[in-house]
């Protein structure tokens, strides 16, 4: 009986060159990958170096002295603007305070001018009271003179008398206390019981009147 050996023959075993071929292929691929990474890293390094060079060139082109001059000019402008604002604010406050003072003085002394116009009237009245002569004619003349002085004071103070006899009734300037039969047209002022007065077109006191009744 012929026996066959389980040991492979030399012809069945791979040669040394065949065994090393897969290892050589893997090594080549790894080397190629490393080379590609190295190339990319080198390109990135060159790009970064280029950017740094551009930045350095831009910084070198900046005139530091000019920038400092511009900064100082801007600071000076800001200081001037602040001073102008502070000055304007102070002036506005002074104007407001002066305005308040003027209004307060106007309220306090509004009657001062008119009071001065009335002083001659007071003098005449006091002189009339001091007269003990008992002369009625002289007393009347004194009263008439005093009345003229009072009218003059009213005129200076822009006070106007309302004596609307024969005028149409005006509810803004007249106060009717009754309606009476009369020959005048209806709503015509027939009589003035108490004269009214205005101050610069503002009614101080309406005239008390009677008015013609409708026929």
UniProtKB/Swiss-Prot annotation:
The keyword Ubl conjugation does not apply. One of its GO terms (cellular component) is cytosol. Residues 29-52 have a biased composition (Low complexity). It comes from Ralstonia pickettii (strain 12J). Disulfide bonds: none annotated. Belongs to the GrpE family. Residues 1-28 have a biased composition (Polar residues). This is Protein GrpE. Residues 1-52 are annotated as: Disordered. Keywords: Chaperone, Cytoplasm, Stress response. GO terms for molecular function: adenyl-nucleotide exchange factor activity; protein homodimerization activity; protein-folding chaperone binding; unfolded protein binding. The lineage of its organism: Bacteria, Pseudomonadati, Pseudomonadota, Betaproteobacteria, Burkholderiales.
